[in-house]
Regions:
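Hydrophobic structural elements of the Rossmann-like NAD(P)H-binding subdomain
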Residues: 1, 67, 108-111, 121
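Catalytic loop of short-chain dehydrogenase/reductase
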Residues: 6-7, 13, 17-35, 40, ...
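A short, exposed helix-loop element centered on a Lys and neighboring polar residues
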Residues: 51-52, 95
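Helix-to-beta-strand junctions that scaffold the AdoMet/dcAdoMet cofactor pocket
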Residues: 58-61, 102
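Conserved Rossmann-fold SDR core element
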Residues: 91, 101-116, 152-160
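C-terminal helical subdomain
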Residues: 110, 128-187
Length: 187
């Protein structure tokens, strides 16, 4: 990682199988076991691995930011048990890693985007209300704002909502709109 990128100051961790549906309509006992395995291998394990490797470099330089992409499914049932468990694991990893890095100058956060206009969301746009959606670049602006904050360590271990960061730091989406933060109750 260090050789490929010349060092790590900031890292965003998002892992998912491209093309997967957001939720699956069948209950967990009707799900194929490979879905659970894939969710934890491509999501949780990859988050742990990338954070571990990135943290080593950041600890050496006594600074850095790791933003693990998660979602409200960590805190509320949103249609799929494996998805919710993987997001909850991501949030727990973030809190515990942040605790272990507290004295190392490295910040870890869980970052919740809103409804992101990915290719699959746009393909199925009739199923979604896109009026409060976010571009794929919006979450990147949230990370850039965090990375520019000299007091970002005070947020370490927290769950942050990208749209709330837009309001706090004063950035909008690429279309000029300011997405409204989605709350747990609305998710």
């Amino acid at each position: 990682m260090n050789n490929a990128w010349g060092g790590y100051e900031h890292m965003v961790e998002k892992t998912a199988e491209d093309g997967w549906d957001f939720t699956w309509p069948r209950p967990f006992w009707e799900q194929p076991l490979w879905r659970w395995d894939a969710m934890f291998a491509s999501g949780v394990r990859a988050t742990y691995t990338a954070s571990r490797l990135g943290a080593r470099l950041m600890v050496a330089q006594k600074s850095g930011l790791i933003a693990n992409i998660s979602f409200w499914a960590a805190q509320k049932y949103l249609g799929n048990t494996a998805y919710g468990a993987a997001k909850a694991a991501t949030d727990k990893l973030t809190r515990d890693m942040a605790h272990e890095l507290l004295d190392q100058g490295v910040t870890l956060v869980s970052l919740y985007p809103g409804l992101v206009r990915t290719e699959s969301v746009l393909r199925d746009a009739a199923e979604f209300d896109l009026s409060n959606s976010e571009s794929q670049q919006f979450v990147g602006r949230a990370v850039a704002a965090l990375a520019s904050d000299p007091q970002v360590m005070r947020k370490s271990g927290q769950v942050l909502v990208a749209a709330a960061l837009g309001q706090e730091y004063g950035f909008g989406d690429i279309d000029g709109k300011q997405p409204r933060p989605v709350t747990l109750e609305e998710a």
